[in-house]
């Protein structure tokens, strides 16, 4: 069945003018999701342009199955556009991607964080540079294959304002990675797959006769060959591979390691020490290159402090979260459902109190905020986790350890 004969998608673009008078740029990664978006919009009669970004060319990474925007993906996107009968363009964003995504990714690991480069890519490349390019091409919208919903916000005092909501397919929910999308970007972006389950997306791809119908989903971090973070970090930041001590929360030196880049908060396997008790990575002390370990209960966190907060509520952040705070739901992991929380803003900063404690929260990760726990919950934005507070005894032990002098 051709794209012209398919039923309309569940999520429309909400424009007042006719589709044939509406130009839409589709960000095409070469995967099934963005390809189906292009096909659905073409079927509805929109003036569709496909754009693929050449983001990197790092040897093995380009040829790795499941990578995004690499050589094969560009070819796949081109074939899809030929099948659909729409123009396709490839833009070289390698330098920009390296400066705004890859280098900060490595720097974050050196600082003892566990970064999310996909958020940075959306912030600085896809929803900034590509969006600007779409506007230069006279497009009315930039459409992507993300699983998230957007629709007009009836509570907004500004006509045309849109809000983000969780998608129909909770297993494919990408709202966690899109918390940093600004209001201006949301108003211009469209997400036609927000109301579709993934299985339906693949079915549509087969009906359209697209070469990517059975293509595997892309991996989260596209530029890391075979998932070996340490290789690219060591290449860009050799200091991250410097040896250091593995220290217990109680101050005992238990062993040594070959670089904090090999560890993340909450890790148990592969620490490299045998003590007869289960120990977990509790903190990465980048300044003194110490990996601090402790029992599982030392990981439990009820409060996280945020930086670079992107607030998408109807009131200002200060109005909403001062005083008793803003009751909401929070996700500190992409795979978890939103859980009850309270957002606060005061003299100490912006922080979220989690009603149910979470274990192994790492700085550099995200905390996304929602109106409710279920699908179609509104996305209120979020921020990057700057630090977390553990249960009192573990927090006291950690502060004492960090304040103590380190042997030369």
Swiss-Prot record:
GO terms for biological process: tRNA wobble position uridine thiolation. Its EC number is 2.8.1.13. Disulfide bonds join 121-222. ATP binds at residues 27-34, 53, 145. Residues 172-174 are annotated as: Interaction with tRNA. It is found in: Cytoplasm. It catalyses: S-sulfanyl-L-cysteinyl-[protein] + uridine(34) in tRNA + AH2 + ATP = 2-thiouridine(34) in tRNA + L-cysteinyl-[protein] + A + AMP + diphosphate + H(+). The keyword Ribosomal protein does not apply. Its main location: cytoplasm. Keywords: ATP-binding, Cytoplasm, Disulfide bond, Nucleotide-binding, RNA-binding, Transferase, tRNA processing, tRNA-binding. One of its GO terms (molecular function) is tRNA-uridine 2-sulfurtransferase activity. The record marks 146, 365 as: Interaction with tRNA. The active site is at 121 (nucleophile), 222 (cysteine persulfide intermediate). Catalyzes the 2-thiolation of uridine at the wobble position (U34) of tRNA, leading to the formation of s(2)U34. Belongs to the MnmA/TRMU family. This is tRNA-specific 2-thiouridylase MnmA. The lineage of its organism: Bacteria, Pseudomonadati, Pseudomonadota, Alphaproteobacteria, Hyphomicrobiales.
């Amino acid at each position: 069945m051709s794209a012209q004969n398919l039923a309309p998608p569940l999520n429309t673009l909400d424009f007042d003018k006719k589709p044939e008078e509406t130009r839409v740029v589709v960000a095409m990664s070469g995967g099934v999701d963005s390809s189906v978006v292009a096909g659905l919009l073409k079927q509805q009669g929109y003036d569709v342009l496909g754009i693929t970004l050449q983001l990197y060319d790092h040897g093995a990474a380009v040829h790795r199955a499941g990578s995004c925007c690499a050589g094969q993906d560009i070819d796949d996107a081109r074939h899809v556009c030929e099948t659909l009968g729409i123009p396709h363009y490839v833009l070289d964003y390698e330098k920009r991607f390296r400066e705004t995504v890859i280098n900060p990714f490595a720097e974050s690991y050196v600082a003892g964080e566990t970064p999310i480069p996909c958020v940075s890519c959306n912030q600085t490349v896809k929803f900034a540079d590509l969006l600007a390019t779409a506007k230069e091409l006279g497009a009315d919208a930039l459409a992507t294959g993300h699983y998230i919903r957007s629709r007009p916000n009836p509570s907004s005092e500004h006509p045309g304002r849109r809000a983000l909501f969780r998608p129909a397919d909770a297993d494919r929910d990408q709202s966690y990675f899109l918390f940093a999308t600004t209001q201006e970007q949301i108003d211009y972006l469209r997400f036609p797959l927000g109301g579709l389950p993934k299985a339906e997306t693949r079915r549509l791809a087969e009906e359209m006769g697209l070469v990517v119908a059975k293509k595997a989903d892309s991996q989260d971090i596209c530029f890391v060959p075979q998932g070996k973070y340490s290789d690219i970090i060591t290449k860009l930041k050799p200091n991250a591979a410097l040896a250091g001590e593995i220290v217990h929360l109680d101050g005992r030196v238990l062993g040594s390691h070959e670089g904090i880049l090999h560890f993340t908060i909450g890790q148990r396997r592969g620490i490299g020490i045998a003590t007869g008790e289960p120990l977990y990575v509790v903190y990465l002390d980048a300044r003194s290159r110490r990996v601090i370990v402790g029992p599982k209960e030392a990981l439990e966190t009820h409060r996280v402090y945020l930086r670079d907060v992107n607030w998408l509520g109807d009131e200002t952040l200060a109005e909403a979260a001062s005083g008793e705070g803003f009751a909401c739901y929070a996700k500190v992991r992409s795979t978890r459902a939103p859980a009850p929380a309270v957002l606060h803003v005061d003299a100490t900063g912006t922080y979220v109190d989690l009603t149910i404690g979470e274990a192994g929260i790492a700085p550099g990760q995200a905390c996304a905020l929602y109106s409710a726990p279920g699908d179609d919950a509104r996305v209120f934005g979020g921020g990057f986790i700057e630090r977390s507070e553990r249960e009192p005894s573990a927090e006291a032990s950690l502060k004492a350890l960090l304040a103590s002098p380190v042997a030369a």
